[in-house]
Amino acid sequence: MTTQQTPLDAPPRHTGEPGLPLASGRDTLRAAGAILPIVAQGVIARRRHVVALAGKADLDGRGVRVLQDLSTRYGHGPVRLRLPGRRAALVLDADDVRRILDETPEPFAPDTWEKRKALGQFQPHGVLVSHGEARAERRRFNEAVLDTGHPLHRNAAVMARAVAQEAGVLGAEMDRTGELDWDAFVRAWWRVVRRVVLGDGARDDHDLTDELTRLRNAANWSFLLPRRRARRERFRARVREHLERAEPGSLAEMIARTPADPEVDPVDQVPQWLFAYDPAGAVALRALAALVAHPAELTRAREEIGDRDLALPQDLPRLRATVLESVRLWPTTPLLLRETTRPVRWDGGELDARTAMIIPTWYLHRDGRTRADANRFDPQQWLDGAAQEDPALVPFSAGPGRCPGRELVLFTTSSFLAHLLRGRELELAAPVIDPQAPLPAGVDPFAVRLRVRPTG
């Protein structure tokens, strides 16, 4: 849990002139050097080889240390950066994070220029790249379909059966081979995702999600690549075919039943749900690795599972907390972006309109000067309320821009993990995680490997 929100030995802010602190050219380069490895690993789709290299070089950890030094030099921020052709400010203070996220979308809009260029590759009418009335309508539609705010989705019974069946297939493979790695895990995970979102008829449509991955890989380059319009239209046509079945129990059925304003474009909301579920798979596998490396937490998780009927929807608070802690330790959205829609007053100065606000969640979650648990596995904080009271912890963002699929993702991941844990002993083969040592700032999900022994 957290300690004080500011280090006791931090000097007062110094700006050099009236207004918010302005980083020197050298410090702007240092900030860029901390952030660019995060971007290079893939903001929209993870680049497997780059993630591996970043982990070996501890680039995430180095970035945390750089931003710690900058917060000491300039105060916690916002610290304006000297970027050519772009106003930008680095947000290093928890209270500033709270303000920005609470005041989304006005005056802190989530549809930044960079985000519009990136997500335009596969969801140009998605809620994340929308503003004004269009955003409000699309957000309302997303919340209705995703059943935002409810731990168990109204279609949870059908979804739980899909999870149980696919986890059963994966479990049988694990028991036969004696191991679990990323490739086996993600194949099963995508089958779950396609069934939950589009229905059983999409279970084996690997081409659909492969096409989305290609579009997301292009989106990693944001404005540097032209839009793949023909590919996007092929992808949309395929999504539309699945939606037309409106299979009972799927999100596709919810779409068919939910009134939509002409601004919404229901087909264009689906890519975001598929996109969000992809990193959720990495979150789940990291959570499983962390559990196996921490025997006491693993025992508590097994006790929660007990003899529950996992083919039925189950609320599993401890496993949900484990997933949340996995996102806290290794955020799937390491950078949150907002853009000011007008000049904004701040203590000590004013930010101009069209300033990009860069919230480095991977740093805020791991700042050991302000967090006693920065580098250890602590699911309990998600159960006792401590994490929810900390504005620096934003695993699914926060405020009006909070992920509308948070509960659905937590239900799906926790249920999937419960099935994999039942009836087998697991041992972490890679990476090496010592529960007595600080956890690494980066854990490559593609390299996670567990040994499996069935117990009956």
Q: Residue ranges of each PLM-predicted region?
A:
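Glycine-rich loop/turn
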Residues: 55-86
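Short, basic/low-complexity N-terminal boundary segments at the transition from targeting/disordered tails
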Residues: 44-66, 324-328
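Cytochrome P450
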Residues: 2-44, 74-80, 87-91, 95-98, ...
